[in-house]
Amino acid sequence: MEALSMVGSGGVYSWPAALLVAAIVVSASVRWWGIKRQPTTTESKARLPRGSLGWPVVGETLAFISAAYSAQPESFVDKRRLLYGKVFKSHLWGSKAVVSSDAEVSRAVLQADASAFVPWYPSSLMQLMGESSILVLGGGLQRRVHGLAGAFFKSPQLKARLTVDMQRRVADAMDAWQCHGVVRVQDEAKSIVFEILVKALIGLEPGQEMHYLKQQFREFIAGLISLPIKLPGTQLYRSIQAKKRMAKLIQKIVQEKREKRMGGNNNATCKAPRDMIDVLMSNGSEELTDELISDNMIDFMIPAEDSVPVLITLAVKYLSECPLALEQLEEENMELKKRKSAVGGTLEWTDYMSLAFTQHVITETLRIGNIINGIMRKAVKDVEVKGQLLIPQGWCVFLYFRSVHLDGHIYDDPYAFNPWRWKERDMMAASSGFTPFGGGQRLCPGVDLARLEASIFLHHLVTTFRWEAEDDTVVTFPTVRLKRGMPIRVSQNIETSGTATFRSTESASV
């Protein structure tokens, strides 16, 4: 699952640079000097890219963090790209690294199997995820879990159920919006998407247990970016305890399902899976233990914090700043709504996915928003990429998607929000230069659902409300989010003429 950036996925949680550097020093000091004592014959090969390892222990991490907090977070990579080329060596997060802003190199690494590269994450995240997480699993077990998840998330049956649930949940939320005055899109989207995703994963309906799970999830997610110190009172310790409580609840649900199956209930055994737990239990593999199932259900919940809600929120922001795009989006969605109303039909998932311009808006939001800045892999052996580049064993390779998505050689006027660029663009031909959710064997299996959920939200928003967007800015580190949660003031949209329904108080850059 590629829905995690190289520093994890912490949503609204952010650590000052000093704490991050302290974490790096604690986890990297011994490893740095151990590497320095090893023979460096591999490093002397000509195919190793040029670059700088920076300072001892911290390497160039301080410079990366400084750029990440700035208005141009890609400046760290772009400056070195001018000096050394699109691929260069560095030292980040306690590891020697090859940084790639080259679309073809990144694609080659993503397509490589576990015999060449394995996932790499910071120490705190590895401790929190555990060895059974799909984020770190390898080999046949990873392929099995990923394949089962991908098939389930892409199934028409799930999309149909999710569409009904999402429409109902969005409608209920928006009914209450006019009483709120100011609505924070990011918070609303997180609440909606979490409940929808949890139901799809473990079959849990809104109620007391859902509320409890959401509370524990907030504590859990806070530890994804934290000091790698697992002592009582630390954030990592609290997050691990929260995960244990979540796992206990999920394992109770798993056990209840197993008891129904063992009780001779043929309907429970033979009917189509209703959630992801059913899918994994039906596989029959002894490797898919209750612990593995519960751990991975928690991992699959992470996109409900920092992927789909941020995609929705950024789309609202960019539309608020682009009246022509908003107008065309509203016209398209109003036309669909009128057409369905005329025949007394209800909107189905295929209707939402048929909205061409809406899909262009989502695609452009993914490109310019860069919800996932990049990912990291670790070379398990000396790896040659494209016959020219050497990545030594033990080094990490950091695939920096943001610089690719904002590359003027690939996209005209790359910093402009321009959904129309995708009208004539061949998505297959552009695939190496467009990797918002990673790629290869670890491509996020929920990509289709992310698009569907965003489409449903935007449809109901533009056909129900006018809105005034308040000032807000995009924060890109440690994860992408809106600083104030994207506050908007909404009013009922009575007009159906297709006139743009926004008024923004700010025209901000990305």
UniProtKB/Swiss-Prot annotation:
<dbReference type="InterPro" id="IPR017972">
    <property type="entry name" value="Cyt_P450_CS"/>
</dbReference>
<dbReference type="GO" id="GO:0016020">
    <property type="term" value="C:membrane"/>
</dbReference>
<keyword id="KW-0349">Heme</keyword>
<dbReference type="InterPro" id="IPR001128">
    <property type="entry name" value="Cyt_P450"/>
</dbReference>
<dbReference type="GO" id="GO:0010268">
    <property type="term" value="P:brassinosteroid homeostasis"/>
</dbReference>
<feature type="transmembrane region" description="Helical">
    <location>
        <begin position="6"/>
        <end position="26"/>
    </location>
</feature>
<dbReference type="GO" id="GO:0020037">
    <property type="term" value="F:heme binding"/>
</dbReference>
<comment type="function">
    <text>Involved in reduction steps of the biosynthesis of plant campesterol-derivative steroids, ending to castasterone (CS) but missing brassinolide (BL). Catalyzes the conversion of (22S,24R)-22-hydroxy-5alpha-ergostan-3-one (22-hydroxy-campesta-3-one, 22-OH-3-one) to 3-dehydro-6-deoxoteasterone (6-deoxo3DT, 6-deoxo-3-DHT), 3-epi-6-deoxocathasterone (3-epi-6-deoxoCT) to 6-deoxotyphasterol (6-deoxoTY) and of 6-deoxocathasterone (6-deoxoCT) to 6-deoxoteasterone (6-deoxoTE).</text>
</comment>
<keyword id="KW-0479">Metal-binding</keyword>
<dbReference type="GO" id="GO:0016132">
    <property type="term" value="P:brassinosteroid biosynthetic process"/>
</dbReference>
<keyword id="KW-0472">Membrane</keyword>
<protein>
    <recommendedName>
        <fullName>Cytochrome P450 90D2</fullName>
        <ecNumber>1.14.14.147</ecNumber>
        <ecNumber>1.14.14.-</ecNumber>
    </recommendedName>
</protein>
<keyword id="KW-0812">Transmembrane</keyword>
<dbReference type="InterPro" id="IPR002403">
    <property type="entry name" value="Cyt_P450_E_grp-IV"/>
</dbReference>
<keyword id="KW-0560">Oxidoreductase</keyword>
<dbReference type="GO" id="GO:0016709">
    <property type="term" value="F:oxidoreductase activity, acting on paired donors, with incorporation or reduction of molecular oxygen, NAD(P)H as one donor, and incorporation of one atom of oxygen"/>
</dbReference>
<dbReference type="GO" id="GO:0005506">
    <property type="term" value="F:iron ion binding"/>
</dbReference>
<dbReference type="Pfam" id="PF00067">
    <property type="entry name" value="p450"/>
</dbReference>
<keyword id="KW-0503">Monooxygenase</keyword>
<feature type="binding site" description="axial binding residue">
    <location>
        <position position="444"/>
    </location>
    <ligand>
        <name>heme</name>
    </ligand>
</feature>
<comment type="similarity">
    <text>Belongs to the cytochrome P450 family.</text>
</comment>
<comment type="pathway">
    <text>Plant hormone biosynthesis; brassinosteroid biosynthesis.</text>
</comment>
<dbReference type="InterPro" id="IPR036396">
    <property type="entry name" value="Cyt_P450_sf"/>
</dbReference>
<keyword id="KW-0408">Iron</keyword>
<keyword id="KW-1133">Transmembrane helix</keyword>
